[in-house]
Amino acid sequence: MKKNYKILLIGYSNIARKRLIQTFVKKKIPFCVASKSFKKKIKGSYQQFNDYNQALKNSGADIVYLSLPNSMHFPWSKKILKLGYHLIVDKPITTKVGELNQLIRIAKRKKLLLTEATFFNYHNQFKFVKKFIGKHRNIEQVFVNFTIPMPKKNSLLLSQKFHGGTFMDMSPYTASINRILFEEKLKKKSIIVKKNIQKLIISYDVFLKY
């Protein structure tokens, strides 16, 4: 019998509002929300919390979807895994390799799901690209360009404090390309970044050789 998992959504981010909640409702997935900033009733949520710790204690959820600012991903992910929840984290899952390795060790030890959420790979253009590559296995070079509209001045994407910037926002896409399209072993990489006056990365170029 297929289990109907309950999801606790921690954080009421743009992606949560625009994509996650409507998907949960459409797919009839039981979910509740923990948000410190949003107090109004959220359609479809079986329960709402204004405190993350209370939500983790009382939600009755099986899976946590973490959708907080980048700088908060690691400490909350570590806590959530230690409490025994399966965990999905908005990209980037962490901002440092050492932090990621810690989370992986905890998840393996406790036999829990730990994954980073990306959405771009479900776009119709990627379905087309995968189909195209499947018919042309002699491809030697792939050029990919990810761009987004300029964020608003108060956006967390432009916040040094919350570990924003282009690299944190877009590098999970870059890292996922090979896994999605080729599944080859990485042999060499080089990265060039451009920073603004606040030392925030605003663009970057990556060369990956497989």
Where is each model-derived feature located?
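Contiguous beta-strand/loop segments that form the cofactor/metal-binding neighborhood of enzyme cores
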Residues: 1, 169, 175-210
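N-terminal Rossmann-like dinucleotide-binding module
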Residues: 1-44
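Residue-level detector of anion-binding/catalytic polar loops
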Residues: 30, 86, 113
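Short, Asp-centered acidic motifs that coordinate Mg2+ and/or phosphate
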Residues: 31-32, 62-63, 141
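Beta-loop-alpha module in the N-terminal Rossmann-like domain of NAD(P)-dependent dehydrogenases
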Residues: 46-88, 92-106
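Rossmann-fold dehydrogenase core element
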Residues: 101-119, 137-144
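Predominantly a Rossmann-like dinucleotide-binding segment in NAD(P)-dependent oxidoreductases
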Residues: 120-187
